[in-house]
Regions:
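Extracytoplasmic loop-helix module adjacent to an early transmembrane segment
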Residues: 18-50, 66-70
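Membrane-lumen/periplasm interface segments of specific transmembrane helices
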Residues: 18-22, 30, 37, 171-174, ...
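Transmembrane-helix motifs of polytopic, lipid-linked glycan transferases
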Residues: 79-100
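Transmembrane and membrane-interface helices of multi-pass
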Residues: 89, 95-96, 104-127, 139-142
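Specific aromatic-rich, kink-prone transmembrane helix
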Residues: 91, 131-153, 298-302
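Multi-pass, polyprenyl lipid-linked donor-dependent membrane glycosyltransferases
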Residues: 117-137, 158-167, 295
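Membrane-interface alpha helices of multi-pass inner-membrane proteins
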Residues: 138-142, 149-175, 201, 279
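Transmembrane helical bundles and short interhelical boundary loops of multi-pass, membrane-embedded
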Residues: 320-395
Length: 395
């Protein structure tokens, strides 16, 4: 019961602060970019033929759920996103408790919940996205990997929301061929392979259903887009995106990388999923951080495994510096700014504190000089933290 109270209290606190402090985006009447297409689909579902720009037109799951809410389409999507963001916290709690020392779980959840990119914060700025229910489906699928029927059902529903959910069954299938050890693991690999095949089939079925019920207004070539970003995404911007998404907690992971590597060796399916996420984040588009967030359930476990190797009672100074760094980089107490391309430059301290344009927060910021400074700050802080952790381990 206590764990549920912690999740509820954390969700309530973040939601209350966001309601009071975070103004929603004003661009395109508050609908944003892809959100305008999802809002259009929500208004069409059950009333008229569904159509929107490609590839957004095939992500019909969340808009059709929003159509069931007796509110205008935008508010319906917002409602689905708020409920999904709360559900996600409970799902993450269940997921982390399977792999991480229980005492660390509330801290990992708090760091996730307060980060400006994660759903409990982000849906109050961008209410019409479908990423939040998709992330719920990803974590739900991770929890059900060895139960084929339930796993397939989640993959089917998830693929209707966003095709990214397929990273879970694809990773599970790859991992099932690597688990070649004791008989109990071989049996587990067989169950996982069955679930993975069922999940892939269900996910593909979901994508086919989406293409039968919704048609594109424009043409979009996924191979062309992937080819473009594979060639044109700057490597340093890609590295910065990892720091923006996960902050200086990556230093903990780097300092005790063997603990994280042991986890991935024990569960190769998660390693395969991370590889898929890393590739998609590179070739998927300019929103690198949004793609990396799909791997956050696994990254959080890896950070937890590494953090468990540190005696935090003897490293309170380290803990204080790390906590401050996480709060600053995650903008725990700073709002997400609106869309204002003409906004003045905002120099960063990990994050640009005074930024008045949301693009300045991302790795694809138009101000690449500012991005270079931010990356240098992240690297410098990480070097200090890794050295500090290593010193504590020796003392």
């Amino acid at each position: 019961m206590k764990r549920y109270l912690v999740c509820a209290a954390l969700a309530g606190l973040v939601i209350t602060l966001s309601m009071v402090l975070q103004p929603p985006i004003s661009y395109n009447g508050g609908l944003g970019w892809d959100g305008a297409q999802y809002t259009q689909l929500a208004g069409q579902c059950g009333r008229e033929p569904m159509h929107a720009y490609e590839p957004f037109t095939y992500r019909v799951g969340a808009p059709c759920l929003a159509a069931l809410v007796p509110l205008p389409p935008k508010l319906g999507l917002w409602t689905i996103n708020i409920l999904s963001s709360i559900l996600l916290l409970f799902l993450l709690d269940a997921w982390l408790r399977q792999h991480v020392h229980l005492i660390l779980v509330p801290y990992l959840l708090a760091g996730f919940a307060f980060h400006w990119l994660t759903p409990l914060r982000h849906v109050w700025w961008y209410p019409t996205s479908v990423d939040t229910p998709a992330l719920c489906a990803i974590v739900g699928a991770l929890l059900l990997t060895e139960t084929p029927v339930a796993f397939a059902a989640v993959c089917l529903a998830g693929a209707l929301i966003r095709e990214s959910v397929l990273i879970v069954p694809l990773g599970a299938l790859a991992g099932s061929f690597v688990r070649l050890a004791p008989p109990n693991l071989v049996a587990k690999a067989g169950r996982m392979r069955t679930s993975a095949i069922a999940g892939i089939a269900a996910g593909v079925a979901g994508m086919v259903i989406a293409r039968l019920v919704s048609t594109p207004d424009t043409h979009y070539s996924l191979p062309d887009a992937a080819y473009y970003w594979a060639l044109h995404k700057p490597p340093l911007a890609y590295l910065l995106a990892w720091f923006i998404t996960f902050g200086p907690a990556l230093a903990v992971l780097a300092a005790h990388w063997k603990a994280a590597a042991a986890f991935l060796a024990e569960f190769p399916e998660y390693a395969a999923m991370l590889v898929l996420v890393a590739i998609l984040a590179w070739i998927g588009g300019s929103d690198t951080e949004r793609f990396l967030l799909w791997g956050s359930p696994i990254i959080l476990v890896m950070i937890g495994k590494a953090a468990d190797r540190i005696d935090w009672r003897r490293a309170r100074g380290l803990l204080a510096v790390l906590a401050i760094g996480l709060a600053i980089s995650g903008r725990w107490f700073l709002i997400i700014p609106d869309y204002w391309p003409e906004a003045p430059r905002a120099w960063p301290l990990l994050t640009p504190w005074t930024a008045a344009h949301y693009e300045l927060l991302f790795s694809h910021t138009p101000d690449q000089a500012m991005a270079a400074v931010a990356l240098g700050e992240y690297v410098a802080l990480s070097v200090v933290l890794v050295g500090w952790i290593k010193w504590h381990a020796r003392s």
